[in-house]
UniProtKB/Swiss-Prot annotation:
<keyword id="KW-0325">Glycoprotein</keyword>
<dbReference type="InterPro" id="IPR040692">
    <property type="entry name" value="UGGT_TRXL_3"/>
</dbReference>
<comment type="subunit">
    <text>Monomer as well as in a tight complex with SELENOF. Interacts with METTL23. Part of a large chaperone multiprotein complex comprising DNAJB11, HSP90B1, HSPA5, HYOU, PDIA2, PDIA4, PDIA6, PPIB, SDF2L1, UGGT1 and very small amounts of ERP29, but not, or at very low levels, CALR nor CANX.</text>
</comment>
<dbReference type="Pfam" id="PF06427">
    <property type="entry name" value="UDP-g_GGTase"/>
</dbReference>
<feature type="short sequence motif" description="Prevents secretion from ER">
    <location>
        <begin position="1548"/>
        <end position="1551"/>
    </location>
</feature>
<feature type="glycosylation site" description="N-linked (GlcNAc...) asparagine">
    <location>
        <position position="1228"/>
    </location>
</feature>
<keyword id="KW-0808">Transferase</keyword>
<dbReference type="Pfam" id="PF18401">
    <property type="entry name" value="Thioredoxin_13"/>
</dbReference>
<dbReference type="GO" id="GO:0032991">
    <property type="term" value="C:protein-containing complex"/>
</dbReference>
<keyword id="KW-0328">Glycosyltransferase</keyword>
<dbReference type="InterPro" id="IPR040497">
    <property type="entry name" value="Glyco_transf_24"/>
</dbReference>
<dbReference type="Pfam" id="PF18402">
    <property type="entry name" value="Thioredoxin_14"/>
</dbReference>
<dbReference type="Pfam" id="PF18404">
    <property type="entry name" value="Glyco_transf_24"/>
</dbReference>
<comment type="similarity">
    <text>Belongs to the glycosyltransferase 8 family.</text>
</comment>
<dbReference type="GO" id="GO:0006486">
    <property type="term" value="P:protein glycosylation"/>
</dbReference>
<dbReference type="Pfam" id="PF18400">
    <property type="entry name" value="Thioredoxin_12"/>
</dbReference>
<feature type="glycosylation site" description="N-linked (GlcNAc...) asparagine">
    <location>
        <position position="536"/>
    </location>
</feature>
């Protein structure tokens, strides 16, 4: 007789023989089938999940164009040209042939790796959001009637090219449009000309016609041509998304919470769940392979597979001793497979763990595996901070955070890395050398640069080390290490803190700065203070005519005759005479001097013969030389303060902060022995690496632009025709090929080797060397280069006049010398050429040969100089125009590929700037790259070139975290290893994972997709936990991700990627959850089934869950610049120019966080009209898409990644003392929120003017059909017991499509209002993973931001409650100043005493005799709640407690009870909530509400309890059911009035 045991034995044996697939399967199946048919049969059940966008799918051609645009606009325009006739997929036989045509066109511009990334990107539909954003921007224009394509000229639209001419004539009268980063701008020859935006669909004939006409206009300089995608007739298909996870969690059935209402299944396309998996392994049998080998046995194979599935799907619980080693055993099972198959096994086990666990307990674990894992774990902890069981992923050493990084960010990382690796590969750097160079940390440091303050130009007021006023202070630096209270400023007799005021005495702010200096001195702040007076330094000007010179001479006189301190006192007396709003005058100085020094002739101090003029010239020289920017400037230890920090109120505070900050720096230096007592402290400060001779904001700016120097070719600038046909990268390569360099020890070129020195710094000097400014720049560069052996320089000429022999003599001479002369001769000759007198002499007709230098071959030089070929100059000019985007004659310095400029006409860029540039390059990148290049053993000239090219490539990368080194992890026994293909660029990918964690469920499928996408050296290290005491994974999981678009058998696009749970066990109760990227808000839109309670035994075949991406979130952080604190209660609105207020939100005090719901498009962020807008103004914004000075803050949402902005606000001058929350309701009396008050009396929204005090606001949450059934009954019980208007607020996140469809109908029948509110759990707040706990979190954590400010008070009523009284009474209940009121737990039912956990332990001591309150019913005074920042306090406490998995077991209840000391609770009278579990029967008759609490003693199902406890419950239930039947009938007959209900859910959503 057959038994399940026999089947399992047979399966196990077969699994061992899995490689012998060609055994006679007919025999095996013939043996197995009798067993199979003797077992109970059951249909295979499945659950599928899909996620689509709200917007329609765009042609893949458009998305491919955006992929290329990310690489360069050049590639975009070339691709557009190449695809003019592709059209849409309608023009092709099949979708597949259209797809192939798009790929073929794109592949011409892409490397093989980039080709794979394009396929992946099209599968992800990454750029569909970009196309939709353009579509929304086009709709906002709006498009003219009946136009497939249209043009917009400065806000005027047309689709008629004839009308374009007239619009161009008047364009200058209208403002230019705001252009966005993602716009496609055609290269323009005249940036000043009008902007013409073409909205059209590429690949179509109509586009092609207009496009070519616009190109010709652009080339003529008549227009600036910008292209934006626009589809006049979009497809009706939505976009199927991927890059998310679907979890099927097993629910506890301790309390039965499943609705008994029967639902009708829907028709589902059977191909959706076809067994298409090529491997399809069950218990060792590879059914995909078997179907291929034995097609005739397909029916029997199907039955046999079904039997094996059912026999493995039993989920009997495991004993504790069986759980202990599960993590190691799973690792052993995974590592037993070879190569990529081990990833397949990891994916299969982790994603189906509940049914795999029993079999895994039989796996043996080798001692080597265990020992290696434990050894590696020491390294994991020490180097990357991982504990056993933690997971991590690194790509080329970059940490990919699995919790916060979504697949779209990961794709960006892959793409950026591909660019760098391919760049290095093109430069001939491969394999290990490539990865060593890639991991160099060469990002420019964020250091604040300082200038040297050891200058005679500074007049020091005091000196802490010698002045007698500081004699009582200790002088030892060891004092720094003595403990003090935080914030105490140490008074030590050392010049540790030096403050220099660089001022123009007659500037209006000077008086304020001097009074701050006086405050520091009089309060004995340990600051050495100095002044630099920047005054007119002309010798003709004296102090009797010029107030600035008068102040300087008066100060110098007193300093010389007495001392600096007295000189400063004189200075303050002078400025005390200056009235507010005025500036200092000569008479102010004269009157003070006459009063203080009556015996001295004032004219002798201030007049023409004054002897007190020292450091007047030096002061101006120092100011100009250091380049510190416009006056006034204040330096702290040489570092300039920001302009906004010079505000008198700010400066004092910031200086104190700086003193404390630098004290920490000195403490460390003293502790480490770097700074000792006998050292000069100022010398020590000035020898720090951040001290530079000159601060040039051009050089130090964070925004940096680099040339792409990675192309290689054999072209040169001396063939202009060939040069002009190259693309930007090709032109740059030709320029680099043609360069000859000047160096200190001579010139290295292709022919001449004077030395074998690698020079890590390369300057290309760009300018018109036939003009004085270009020559000056070259001269300064040569002067600097003579002092440094690290530098080589060469030149690119950017002529300012028409090119001819007569307009270019000097550059032609320079070029001829570089081509023909030995290095030292060329350098000396070019130095002469850079001098002004040479240019003057040449212009006067002197022969060029007159300027020859010793050792020069004059005849060879003259031969080249006089040759008529001008190709090299034409090539240089074209390069400056097309690649460097310069106007004629503009100057630029290119240092290791970094473009600095264009410089302004009169802008100084001198020897010190070159010194600073060299300094920075050597420190950040030059030396590190040089040492690696030296190891490659290439010749010197090539090596210097390589340093330059590698530096440009690496420095151009976006700044990120440092790469992590992980070479020392052992991988013999405990790691999956996949070697890369030889000879190709590869990614170095390292994963650390515990195979029985949620991270493994995501990581395994991700790595499997990556193996198909990219060439990689992959190591996956096992990081197992030992001694498990609980089942580590209690859910099934699918990660939706495909490496390429798939097609059906007839070559049509397959119905997007979906999650499939096939062959699921049928006995458990499941709940379905989606894990989506942080910024996505999704909702369930179609399924008749209860996704919170999926019970497959009651399902016919398939549960198909359809979700929709409802919103993309715009998130932000907001701060008040005056206080540095978030402006609590500030409101923002988000809208478009046509509809300014679509959504709004409130700023939290936690991190100043806010979130707004949006979708792809251009959005305008504003302060909300009312108090927010009255009190505040937006001061600055970061991460947005509009210029900093623009009135509107524009934000573009054009991808699926998170968009996080920073907004700084400032109170308006006349509102400085206003409190935002003091009267926060006025702004809500009308306007936006009123438009949401939506009654059902047929009135328009704006006519419904309810008095907000005469409405009962009731908030509730529900998930699953049973609780939604309870919720409808609760609502009915509320409505039956009150005459006051009611508005229900429901948390939208977890409501089923069925509920959302029915609620508008119910609202209309019973005449109540409702709104669906929504908030995405912020990423920075500790996440809950279990659905029930997430819902509990929403009940308490976001009350201040979930509701608009119009809501002053609301009641929370649990879904499973029955109300028996008028809730108006509770709404009007006096909370005695508390922000909320809760009912305490009953303690009258004595038999439940053993279950009252709050009566003992932690809760008993914390409550100290107070009541423990139940969260089923509460009332919140939102005005008070916000005023005392209750929401922020609750979130803060939650963040601390929730890290411990054992705390907050009843989150929504434990948190407010835990916070009673910080956020007081008003206890409501007991009769407000009666619950049979805790309250005795006698008190039931007084009950105002009855709650169907769970009973831990009886575990009675909710439905049974409801019928037994509440007599009226069944009547309510029947009434609702009748209404649902009516609704269904009307829906099927088509008589349902859907005008209101269709929009219901949208109309009522709010944040």
């Amino acid at each position: 007789m057959c038994s399940r045991g026999d089947a399992n034995t047979a399966d196990a044996a077969a699994a061992r023989r899995v490689t012998g697939l060609r055994y006679n399967m007919r025999l095996l199946i013939a043996l197995a089938l009798p067993c199979l048919f003797s077992l109970a049969e059951a249909n295979s059940k499945a659950i599928t999940t899909s996620l689509t966008t709200k917007w329609f799918s765009a042609p893949l051609l458009l998305e491919a164009s955006e992929f290329l645009a990310e690489d360069s606009q050049e590639k975009f325009w070339s691709f557009v040209e190449a695809t003019q006739n592709i059209g849409s997929s309608d023009h092709h036989d099949t979708d597949h042939s259209y797809y192939d045509a798009v790929l073929e066109a794109a592949f011409r511009f892409l490397s093989p790796l980039q080709q794979n990334l394009l396929k992946f990107c099209l599968s992800l539909r990454s750029y569909s959001a970009s196309i939709q954003a353009f579509q929304q921007i086009a709709v906002d224009e709006p498009p003219p009637e009946g136009c497939k394509s249209f043009l917009s000229v400065h806000g005027k639209q047309t689709c008629d090219l004839d009308t374009l001419e007239s619009l161009l004539l008047t364009a200058a009268d209208r403002p230019k449009p705001l252009l966005f980063k993602g716009d496609h701008r055609y290269p323009s020859s005249n940036p000043e000309s009008p902007v013409v935006i073409l909205y059209s669909e590429i690949g179509h004939e109509e586009f092609s016609n207009i496009h070519h006409q616009l190109i010709s206009k652009s080339n003529e300089g008549k227009i600036n041509y910008v292209f934006r995608h626009y589809i006049s007739n979009p497809s009706k298909e939505p976009v199927y998304l991927s890059g998310y996870g679907v979890e099927l969690a097993i629910k506890s059935t301790e309390y039965k919470a499943k609705d008994d209402t029967q639902v009708k299944g829907t028709e589902v396309n059977a191909t959706v769940i076809g067994e298409s998996d090529p491997i399809d392994e069950v218990q060792g049998f590879l059914f995909g392979k078997l179907r291929e080998l034995y097609p005739a046995l397909e029916g029997q194979l199907k039955e046999f597979r079904k039997h094996l599935v059912e026999s493995t799907n039993e989920m009997a619980p495991l004993k504790v001793w069986q759980l202990q080693d599960l993590s190691f055993q799973t690792a052993a099972r995974i590592l037993a497979a070879s190569g990529a198959l081990s990833l397949v096994v990891m994916k299969d086990i982790s994603q189906n763990f509940p049914t795999k666990a029993r079999a895994i307990t039989k796996t043996a674990v080798s001692a080597q595996l265990r020992a290696e894992v434990e050894e590696n774990q020491k390294y994991f902890k020490g180097t990357i901070g991982l504990q056993p069981g933690d997971s991590a992923l690194f790509i080329n050493g970059l940490h990919i955070d699995l919790d916060t990084q979504d697949i779209f960010s990961l794709f960006d990382t892959l793409r950026n890395e591909a660019r760098v690796m391919e760049g290095l590969h093109r430069l001939g750097i491969e394999g290990l050398s490539l990865h060593n160079i890639l991991k160099l940390n060469i990002q420019p440091s964020e250091t604040d640069y300082a200038v040297d303050i050891r200058s005679p130009a500074i007049s020091w007021v005091n000196n802490l080390e010698v002045d007698s006023r500081y004699n009582s202070w200790p002088s030892s630096l060891q004092e720094l290490l003595r403990p003090t209270f935080p914030g105490v400023i140490r008074q030590i007799r050392k010049n540790l803190h030096n403050m220099v005021f660089i001022i123009d005495p007659v500037h209006e702010t000077t008086a304020e700065l001097i009074s701050i200096a006086e405050m520091f001195l009089s309060n004995h702040i340990p600051l050495r203070i100095g002044f630099i007076f920047v005054v007119n330094d002309s010798e003709d000007v004296d102090g009797m005519q010029d107030a600035g010179v008068a102040v300087l001479r008066a100060y110098n006189y007193v300093a010389q005759e007495v001392d600096g301190y007295h000189a400063f006192q004189t200075l303050t007396q002078i400025y005390n005479k200056v009235r507010t709003g005025e500036t200092v005058k000569v008479e102010h100085v004269v009157s003070v001097l006459e009063k203080k020094y009556p015996y001295v002739e004032v004219n002798s101090i201030l007049g023409i013969d004054s002897a007190y003029d020292q450091n007047r010239k030096e002061a101006r020289g120092y100011y100009e030389q250091t380049g510190v920017g416009p006056l006034p400037v204040v330096l702290f230890n040489g570092m300039p303060f920001e302009k906004e920090q010079l505000d008198p109120d700010e400066l004092e505070t910031i200086t104190m902060h700086k003193i404390l900050e630098t004290t920490t720096f000195f403490q460390r230096a003293v502790y480490l022995g770097e700074l000792s007592h006998d050292q000069d402290v100022v010398e020590y400060i000035m020898n720090q690496p951040n001290v530079v001779p000159r601060i040039n904001s051009r050089i130090l700016t964070a925004k940096r632009e680099y040339l792409d120097l990675t192309a290689s070719n054999n072209f040169y600038v001396d063939d202009f025709a060939r040069f002009s046909a190259l693309d930007s990268r090709g032109k740059t390569a030709a320029i680099a090929n043609s360069m000859n360099y000047l160096t200190k020890k001579g010139m290295s070129s292709k022919e001449i080797y004077d030395d074998s020195f690698i020079r890590p710094v390369t300057f290309w000097i760009v300018g018109d060397f036939d003009s004085p400014s270009g020559r000056q720049l070259l001269y300064d560069a040569i002067k600097h280069q003579k002092t440094s052996n690290n530098v080589r320089i060469s030149m690119i000429n950017n002529p300012s006049q028409e090119i001819s022999d007569s307009s270019t003599p000097i550059f032609r001479a320079i070029w001829a010398a570089l081509q023909t002369q030995a290095s030292s001769s060329a350098k000396n000759f070019i130095t002469k050429m850079a001098k002004e007198e040479t240019a003057e002499a040449l212009a006067a007709g002197v022969d060029i040969a007159e300027f020859s230098v010793g050792g020069m071959d004059v005849s060879l030089f003259k031969e080249v100089f006089e040759s008529s070929r001008m190709d090299f100059i034409l090539s240089h000019a074209l390069y400056c125009r097309d690649v460097l985007k310069l106007k004629k004659g503009q100057r630029v310095v290119i240092s290791n590929g970094r473009i600095i400029g264009p410089l302004e006409d009169n802008e100084l860029f001198n020897q010190d700037d070159f010194h600073l540039l060299e300094n920075i390059i050597l420190k950040t990148s030059g030396q590190k790259i040089k040492s690696h290049i030296q190891q490659l053993r290439v010749e010197e000239d090539v090596a210097s070139d390589l340093v330059m090219k590698v530096d440009a490539l690496l420095s151009a990368q976006p700044k990120g975290e440092a790469r992590i080194e992980y070479q020392f992890f052992e991988d013999k026994h405990s790691a999956i290893k996949l070697k890369p293909k030889e000879g190709e660029t590869y990614y170095d990918v390292v994963a650390v994972v515990d195979p029985v964690t949620r991270e493994a469920q995501r990581l395994a499928p991700l790595l499997l997709v990556l193996t198909q996408l990219i060439n990689m050296n992959l190591r996956v290290f096992m990081n197992c936990q030992s001694k498990l005491s609980d089942m580590p994974l209690k859910s099934f999981y699918r990660y939706v991700l495909e490496p390429e678009i798939s097609f059906t058998a007839d070559s049509s696009f397959a119905k997007g990627p979906i999650a499939k749970f096939l062959d699921m066990p049928q006995s458990p109760l499941f709940t379905l959850n989606l894990n989506t990227p942080e910024s996505w808000m999704v909702e369930s839109v179609r399924t008749p089934y209860d996704l919170d309670n999926i019970y497959l035994e009651e399902v016919d075949s398939i549960v198909a869950a359809e979700y929709e991406l409802e919103y993309l979130l715009l998130e932000g952080h907001c701060y008040d610049i005056t206080t540095g604190q978030p402006p609590r209660g500030l409101q923002f609105t988000l809208g478009t120019s046509a509809n300014p207020t679509i959504v709004d939100t409130i700023v939290m005090a936690n991190l100043g966080y806010f979130q707004l719901k949006a979708n792809p498009g251009a959005w305008i962020l504003r302060l909300r009209k009312g108090r927010s807008d009255d009190i505040y103004r937006i001061y600055s914004h970061d991460g947005t898409d509009s210029p900093p000075d623009a009135n509107d803050v524009v934000v573009i949402l054009n991808n699926f990644k998170s968009k996080i902005i920073k907004v700084k606000v400032q109170k308006k001058a006349d509102m400085a003392n206003e409190d935002l929350l003091s009267d926060g309701t006025n702004e809500n009396e009308s306007g936006f929120w009123d438009s949401f008050k939506w009654g059902f009396s047929g009135q328009k929204a704006e006519e419904v003017k309810q008095d907000k005090d005469d409405i009962i606001n009731i908030f509730s949450v529900a998930s699953g059909h049973l609780y939604e059934r309870f919720l409808r009954i609760m609502m009915l019980s509320v409505l039956k017991n009150t005459k006051t208007p009611v508005k229900f607020w429901f948390l939208k996140n977890y409501l089923s499509p069925t509920f959302k469809e029915f609620i508008p109908y119910m609202a209309k029948k019973y005449n109540f209002q409702y709104e669906l509110v929504q908030y995405k759990w912020p990423r920075w707040l500790h996440q809950q993973t279990e659905k029930q706990r997430i819902i509990w979190g929403y009940k308490i954590l976001f009350l201040d931001v979930l509701f608009p400010l119009v809501v002053d008070k609301f009641l929370f009523v649990d879904a499973d409650q029955i109300v028996r009284t008028d809730l108006k009474e509770l709404r009007d209940f006096n909370l005695d100043g508390a922000p909320y009121g809760y009912t305490p737990f009953c303690d009258s039912r004595r038999e439940m005493d053993g279950y009252r956990f709050w009566k003992s332990g932690y809760w008993a001591s914390h409550l100290a005799g107070r009541k423990y309150h139940i969260s089923a019913l509460y009332v919140v005074d939102l005005k008070k709640f916000r005023k005392i920042a209750a929401g922020d306090r609750l979130r803060g406490q939650y963040q601390g407690l929730s890290q411990d998995p054992n705390s907050l077991s009843n989150l929504d209840q434990d948190l407010p009870n835990n916070m009673i000391h910080q956020v007081p609770i008003k206890s409501l009278p007991q009769e407000w909530l009666w619950c049979e579990t805790w309250c005795d029967d006698a008190s039931k008759k007084r009950a105002k509400t009855i709650d169907l609490c769970n009973n831990p003693m009886t575990k009675e199902p909710k439905l049974e309890a409801a019928v037994r406890i509440v007599p009226e419950w069944q009547d309510y239930d029947q009434e609702i059911k009748q209404l649902q039947t009516l609704f269904q009938e009307e829906k099927e007959l088509g008589t349902l009035h859907t005008e209101e209900t269709q929009e219901g859910s949208q109309k009522h959503e709010e944040l």
